[in-house]
């Protein structure tokens, strides 16, 4: 383990994620085949220096400096590895839009951790990176699938150790993700929720989550339809999304089995059979257009490999 040389660079690819999928609030998340790419390079200067260069449509919403999540995550690696921090530049090709409920912040955290760790010879294990990622983000449902890939259920055990279960998602189930031009911060979406819920609502969610996971494992659309319901967060969040109810109704009318807010929103995810994907996509975009909101709705697959890095000269 040694300090990276000036100019040393790694490239980290990190997938978007969708969290909750209805009943899996703050514990269930899935990686999608839409990636942000981070090229991280050591530059001259003190460890407090961090430069951010954004490529892509959404760059105007992000800033560099010490509060940037890539920088903060990298600092956690230096500290955990007992190393002096170094100056970094991060050049980001942004395909995952921020403040849309698709884990953009998780991509920054995972990239900062994985990239900084790679630059110094990977002294930290993937398990340690996972622990740091959850600590920085504050909840596991985006950072875990972003790092590991696939459909992940994460819970803190009685031992206070984070436990991750990789769940099955059959390839015949497709995700249509309607991404609007409007933004919604996670903090605003969390403020909309009550501080306490009835036990009956928690019981309904437990049952729904069981049905959803079995539906995703088997491709049973009826189970997905019955399982993709929530009483913990969605009843309080739909009203924050302009036209959201109409987009959901349009997706179901076009043949989707189920529909949910992606993460904190405002993006909306619909699950359907492969032959329904394009029809569901068109219906969701049209419904948002009627509400005066521009959007796009790609049909996406589960991304199973998670985040990975390579030396810059390898690609």
UniProtKB/Swiss-Prot annotation:
Primary residence: cytoplasm
GO biological process, one term: threonine biosynthetic process
Domain of life: Bacteria
Gene3D superfamilies: 3.30.230.10, GHMP kinase, C-terminal domain
Enzyme Commission (EC) number: 2.7.1.39
GO CC annotation, single: cytoplasm
Family: Belongs to the GHMP kinase family. Homoserine kinase subfamily.
Protein name in the entry: Homoserine kinase
Gene that this sequence comes from: thrB
């Amino acid at each position: 383990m040694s300090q990276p040389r000036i100019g040393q660079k790694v490239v980290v690819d990190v997938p978007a994620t969708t969290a909750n999928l209805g009943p899996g609030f703050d514990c269930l998340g899935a990686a999608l085949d839409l990636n942000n790419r981070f090229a991280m390079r050591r530059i001259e200067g003190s460890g407090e220096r961090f430069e951010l260069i954004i490529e892509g449509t959404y760059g105007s919403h992000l800033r560099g400096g010490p509060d940037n999540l890539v920088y903060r995550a990298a600092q956690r690696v230096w500290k955990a590895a007992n190393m002096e921090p170094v100056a970094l530049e991060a050049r980001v090709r942004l395909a995952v839009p921020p403040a849309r409920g698709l884990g953009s912040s998780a991509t920054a955290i995972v990239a900062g951790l994985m990239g900084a760790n790679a630059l110094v010879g990977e002294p930290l294990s993937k398990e340690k990176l996972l622990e740091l990622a959850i600590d920085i983000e504050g909840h596991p449902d985006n950072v875990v699938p972003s790092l590991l890939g696939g459909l992940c259920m994460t819970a803190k055990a009685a031992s206070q150790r984070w436990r991750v279960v990789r769940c099955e998602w059959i390839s015949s189930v497709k995700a249509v993700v309607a991404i609007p031009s409007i933004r919604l911060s996670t903090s605003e979406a969390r403020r909309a929720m009550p501080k306490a819920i009835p036990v009956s609502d928690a019981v309904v969610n437990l049952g729904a989550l069981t049905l959803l996971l079995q539906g995703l494992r088997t491709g049973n659309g009826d189970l997905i339809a019955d399982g993709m319901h929530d009483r913990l967060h969605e009843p309080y969040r739909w009203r924050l999304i302009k036209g959201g109810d109409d987009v959901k109704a349009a997706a179901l009318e076009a043949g989707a089995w189920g529909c949910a807010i992606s993460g904190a929103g405002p993006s909306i995810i619909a699950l359907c059979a492969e032959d329904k994907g394009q029809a569901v996509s068109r219906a969701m975009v049209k419904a948002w257009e009627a509400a005066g909101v521009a959007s796009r709705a790609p049909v996406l697959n589960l991304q199973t490999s998670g985040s990975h890095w390579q030396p810059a000269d390898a690609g």
